[in-house]
Amino acid sequence: ADIVPDGSIIVPDSMHLAARVGMEGTQCTAALKLLEKEGVLNLDAAYNLATEAYHADLAINNLQVHHFLPKDSIYTLTAKMSAKGQGVDVASRKTVAALNASLEKLQYGHWDISGVEAHAGLKSSVATVRLASDNVLLKMQGNADMRLDRSYLDGALDLNVEEVNLHKLGLVPRPLKHPFAFTMGAEARHDSLKLRLDAGDLNLRFRAHSTLKKLMEQSDKFVSILTKQIDERRLDHAALRQVLPSAGMHLEAGNQNPVSYFLAAKGISYNDFKLSFGFTPQVGINGRTAVHGLRMDSLQLDTIFFTVKQDTARMKLQGGVINGPKNPQFVFRSTLTGEVRNEDAELTVDYV
């Protein structure tokens, strides 16, 4: 029978459902069993109104979800979940909770997903999460923790991704020659933000001397002032520097990392890439980026670079493309040098 007019949700004729709800004093209980051909779903749960203690156990075995959602691409599902705890105020140090879940089998379209486990806990206002996946689409482990009794974001995240199968996920036309893998760590405290990403010979580091909320507020304020100054056709570099967040980013990459492998599958390659930028009210915006040995089809560019330096009166920019004597196509040097001052700008093009 259709539940919604478009037939996207239905109740199969072969379904049998038994449910029991009870209450004795302050103890509430519920049990449910669903049978649909070979599929079985069992739920057992309880909650105490006085102590706020609860538990819930859910087991699903070979349930054909497609029989309930015929317009979706979800088919067989086998999974388990259990939850146990006391208290419902997540900000209270007295609240405790534990959650365990596992996905043994999920058929979604042409994908078969299995080997996924999640564990979460809450104790003394500290929430923890552990996630693991071991299947042909994704092999990874992740850990995270966060304090819930802070007025700011206070937590950490660690990810170890051994392989993401981009070909089976339909993101690239053919299998990559090397695994798409990386490790990532992030940390937010009362006075700093840190991010690191390592993948082969690709290394990214980011750090800010503030909370995430303050960083977002400073960034929004900077964009707002800059937009207003652009509309008024007059830049005040000193005013812009005063609202800059204190942050820095450094990125280095060779040609042995997931990004280079992904680009290679698209017919793009390079020798190395470097980027380094810093932002502080004291020194303004300063940075440099460069790509060496960029190749796209028959085009080869030896060096592409860009630098920026700001003081209280101007922002100096320089960029260019250089092909050296050993370039198989043509040798040249093209540079752009400019200044963006408070009320005007200048740009010089040089081609040799």
Where are these regions (language model features)?
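Membrane-proximal interfacial segments on either side of biological membranes
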Residues: 1-352
